[in-house]
Amino acid sequence: MANYFNTLNLRQQLDQLGKCRFMGRDEFADEASYLKGKKVVIVGCGAQGLNQGLNMRDSGLDIAYALRAEAIAEKRASWRKATENGFTVGTYEDLIPQADLIVNLTPDKQHSAVVQAVQPLMKQGAALGYSHGFNIVEVGEQIRKDITVVMVAPKCPGTEVREEYKRGFGVPTLIAVHPENDPKGEGMAIAKAWAAATGGHRAGVLQSSFVAEVKSDLMGEQTILCGMLQAGSLLGFDKLVSEGTDPAYAEKLIQFGWETITEALKQGGITLMMDRLSNPAKLRAYALSEQLKGIMAPLFQKHMDDIISGEFSGGMMADWANDDVKLLTWREETGKTAFENAPQFDGKIAEQEYFDNGVLMVAMVKAGVELAFETMVSSGIIEESAYYESLHELPLIANTIARKRLYEMNVVISDTAEYGNYLFANAAVPLLKGAFMASLQPGDLGKAVAGTEVDNAQLRDVNEAIRNHPIETVGHTLRGYMKDMKRIAVAG
């Protein structure tokens, strides 16, 4: 199999990278009706598999779970989750032949084996669904020509997909039809019905492509969503402790600071996040973010280039074939860091204190979000896609760190995201550890910025620069569809 993206000519590559249209709510008037009366079989019962299935069943669809025979015989976690929630569970041979739509929600590294196992069992004219297009785009999986291939990609972890649905809402979602596999022209109808069944149509749906989803998703998770948070956590904690800060306080400021800071980002973009700072602190955070962007732009561009070319996916798949040696080594190294093993702080940190004492963290968020967005857009990805894969998902990932530090983040995200996270963080930490971290001033981290003097013209110009960044323009529009988003509880 060959990387699908690399088989396309330049015009086709640009066309698929740039495929992105915000769909009107009227396009979902029929909601999930296209799939009602059809048999939907989900392969895999992890976070996405279980929670999408629960939503789809509550939307009136006929849902069952196909698991490997050994998972059923040994009553593994996937079998327990499906059966405890009252779903029909069977082997591939039991359920796949009758299915109208098979939804593959297993981890990326299992996709080829799963597809090769289920494809011979699929009836003529059935549909195959994904929530991430890595197997199609990067692996280049060949699907039978009578099979329709679609994607519905919620832009949240599976637990959030369920919680938002239970609130009567949903999470923003990308949908796509593989252009090589739409023999009956029904792919979009299937994808729309599936998205509606998960509740995604209530939060906004982007009609995208497999290519655009994969390339933007990989870029976001490697850089700002995971890699920047991991690098910032390790660098920030070590800096605080080296300057005499109580390790327990330093750990809490970092662990819960990302969540608190990005909650403002979620509600009002970079503008609101920066407005939570005093005027002197805002000017300092802006200056630090511009400095960070200058230092890190080549690293962001390298990650984007390696994603576009297939260099990243090739390296990761080689590690799959080598029993995940790199991934497991990096995971172990992260677990041994001082931040991961610091004592817990018993005291309370007020919400505003996270901003006042976390100016560097605010600067890192601003720099990372803008760089990821700018790099994706300059590579042909449309602004709406770039927004969802950078700013939108950041509070959700920060929330995982608040639960159990970096360990929890790396458990919750996919192995693909975790591998990319380590690649980025392992390069970003030494890049910033020397001159940049040494140049920090009192008030950048751990203490509030001293002084109250502000130049009016400078503040005016900085405010205009923040508010006029393209991600703020597109974000204002897209957040309008998400006014019912629940607030993530911030720690004290």
Swiss-Prot record:
Q: Which domain of life is it from?
A: Bacteria
What reaction gets catalysed by this protein? (2R)-2,3-dihydroxy-3-methylbutanoate + NADP(+) = (2S)-2-acetolactate + NADPH + H(+); (2R,3R)-2,3-dihydroxy-3-methylpentanoate + NADP(+) = (S)-2-ethyl-2-hydroxy-3-oxobutanoate + NADPH + H(+)
List of residues binding NADP(+): 45-48, 68, 76, 78, 108-110, 158
What GO biological process terms are annotated to this protein in UniProt? isoleucine biosynthetic process; L-valine biosynthetic process
- Residues bound to substrate: 414
Question: E.C. number, please?
Answer: 1.1.1.86
Q: Where is the active site?
A: 132
Domain KARI C-terminal knotted, first and last residues per copy: 209-344, 345-485
Q: Name one GO molecular function term.
A: ketol-acid reductoisomerase activity
Name its pathway: Amino-acid biosynthesis; L-isoleucine biosynthesis; L-isoleucine from 2-oxobutanoate: step 2/4; Amino-acid biosynthesis; L-valine biosynthesis; L-valine from pyruvate: step 2/4
Domain KARI N-terminal Rossmann, chain residue ranges per copy: 14-208
Q: Would you identify the family this protein belongs to, as annotated?
A: Belongs to the ketol-acid reductoisomerase family.
What job does this protein perform? Involved in the biosynthesis of branched-chain amino acids (BCAA). Catalyzes an alkyl-migration followed by a ketol-acid reduction of (S)-2-acetolactate (S2AL) to yield (R)-2,3-dihydroxy-isovalerate. In the isomerase reaction, S2AL is rearranged via a Mg-dependent methyl migration to produce 3-hydroxy-3-methyl-2-ketobutyrate (HMKB). In the reductase reaction, this 2-ketoacid undergoes a metal-dependent reduction by NADPH to yield (R)-2,3-dihydroxy-isovalerate.
Q: What protein name does the entry list?
A: Ketol-acid reductoisomerase (NADP(+))
Q: Which gene encodes it?
A: ilvC
